Amino acid sequence: MAKEAPAKTGLAVGLNKGHKTTARVVKPRVSRTKGHLSKRTAFVREVVKEVAGLAPYERRVIELLRNSKDKRARKLAKKRLGTFGRAKRKVDELQRVIAESRRAH
């Protein structure tokens, strides 16, 4: 992005010539918010997950994790989700679910 320009001097000559002005505070563009999760969306997803429970493949992944078959669990998640990054995130999330269920009991 452009650097902050030094303040104008109010003179007609020199590097910073021109009228003294106050800088406007510009709101960030809407296009900058793309991909950012809103509070409402996060809340709705949380409620849906709580009501609907886990998908069948998620239950299977949890079963594999409980039997310490981490690599197989990641491969299954990758097959269902498409990319390895998403699969790793999902497996980490499901491991947290297992840990929470252990703490609850």
UniProtKB/Swiss-Prot annotation:
Keyword Cell membrane among UniProt keywords: no
Pfam families per record: Ribosomal_L36e
A GO CC annotation given for this chain: ribosome
Gene Ontology process terms (BP): translation
One annotated GO molecular function: structural constituent of ribosome
Keywords assigned by UniProt, alphabetized: Ribonucleoprotein, Ribosomal protein
InterPro entries: Ribosomal_eL36, Ribosomal_eL36_sf
Annotated region (Disordered), positions in chain: 1-20
Family under the similarity heading: Belongs to the eukaryotic ribosomal protein eL36 family.
Name of the protein: Large ribosomal subunit protein eL36
Annotated source species: Trichoderma hamatum
Top-level taxonomy: Eukaryota, Fungi, Dikarya, Ascomycota, Pezizomycotina
